[in-house]
């Protein structure tokens, strides 16, 4: 039984997606409808991040001069910002390489280079860099010694319950250091084995192969977030189109099964096929929908697609805890779920968990309101 995609774009966001992804006649119609429905000066942040792609898809002649100028400015700003953060990320990758640590660039940066083929159309805030899990401590030490500042006071403790940690450079640019490629922890050995070469800012690294890139985009983008995450749709459609026949669908199904993510993959790919005509083979959808999935996996997927609540927060934390318990990472493990939750939220006492959950929910909703404001 397939699960519906819970976190979908609004009608207005769907229009800007079609303007960014559809062939010219349909894209132009979607753009006109979007302009009639949305005040350009009050565009939500998620839609704003797609406007450089709309500009490239339709071309400057499709807009009146004022709008064309604004869109061109957004594209140039994205291109310039990405060049800067790519250079800083390349510095970090060079530090890791000098320490003998392999790197694999995931998400936005690798998508911009290998799938979009244009670093200006895919805005991003940082660069995601995956290292082998057994080299996590060495990577943190090397980056810290080179002047990169971790976002947490005790980064080694952080690694035991999380999947990534932000680092800020001395100048501009941030990286998100990953030891797991996804929130849902699983072995990334296959990801490394099938990875492809990538050059970022003049430095050699690796990137996920198209099948893995597509699976990561679908799984990472579908959960609810205060900042609308529907950019995953553009990422996934672009990977499918750019990879063409090189996309190994059998691999995608196998990896979704191994990672216990067939429910999320089926929902996301089914939506892309139905709404955007993405070339997802029907047998692939059938295999994903027919794959065995536990009640826990389905419940975690449903919870992830809903707005924040204490129950959702606990369900997702429980999902991460169960998955971590199934892995042999060699790192110390929490004594139980309560200990995991306490360490996950950095609390001194388990008695503070209920209060923290309510406060965290309030803060996250406030951030979402602030980002949505014009």
Task: Locate each region found by the language model.
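Conserved NTP-donor binding/palm subdomain of two-metal-ion nucleotidyltransferases/polymerases, i.e.
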Residues: 2-125, 131-374
């Amino acid at each position: 039984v397939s699960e519906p995609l819970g976190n979908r774009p609004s009608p207005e966001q769907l229009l800007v997606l079609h303007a960014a992804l559809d062939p010219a006649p349909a894209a132009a119609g979607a753009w006109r409808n979007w302009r009639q429905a949305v005040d350009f000066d009050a565009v939500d942040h998620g839609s704003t991040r797609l406007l450089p792609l709309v500009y490239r898809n339709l071309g400057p002649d499709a807009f009146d001069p004022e709008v064309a100028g604004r869109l061109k400015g957004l594209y140039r700003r994205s291109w310039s910002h990405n060049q800067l953060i790519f250079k800083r990320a390349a510095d970090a990758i060079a530090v890791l390489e000098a320490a003998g640590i392999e790197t694999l660039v995931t998400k936005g940066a690798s998508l911009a280079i290998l799938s979009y083929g244009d670093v200006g159309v895919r805005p991003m805030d940082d660069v995601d860099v995956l290292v082998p899990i057994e080299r996590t401590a060495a990577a943190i030490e090397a980056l810290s010694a080179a002047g990169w500042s971790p976002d947490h006071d005790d980064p080694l403790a952080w690694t035991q319950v999380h999947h990534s940690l932000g680092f800020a450079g001395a100048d501009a640019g941030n990286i998100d250091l990953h030891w797991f490629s996804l929130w849902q922890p699983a072995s990334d050995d296959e990801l490394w084995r099938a990875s492809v070469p990538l050059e970022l800012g003049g430095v050699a690294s690796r990137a996920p192969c198209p099948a893995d890139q597509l699976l990561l985009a679908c799984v990472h983008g579908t959960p609810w977030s205060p900042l609308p995450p529907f950019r995953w749709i553009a990422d996934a459609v672009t990977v499918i189109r750019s990879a063409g026949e090189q996309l190994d669908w059998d691999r995608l199904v196998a990896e979704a099964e191994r990672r216990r993510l067939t429910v999320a993959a089926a929902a996301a790919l089914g939506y892309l096929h139905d709404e955007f005509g993405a070339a997802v083979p029907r047998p692939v959808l059938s295999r994903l929908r027919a794959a065995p999935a536990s009640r826990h996996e389905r419940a975690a997927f449903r919870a992830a697609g809903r707005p924040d609540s204490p129950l959702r927060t606990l369900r997702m934390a429980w999902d991460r805890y169960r998955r971590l318990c199934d892995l042999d990472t060699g790192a110390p493990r929490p004594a139980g779920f309560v200990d995991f939750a306490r360490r996950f939220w950095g609390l001194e006492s388990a008695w503070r968990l209920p209060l923290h959950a309510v406060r965290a929910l309030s803060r996250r909703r406030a951030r979402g309101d602030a980002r949505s404001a014009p």
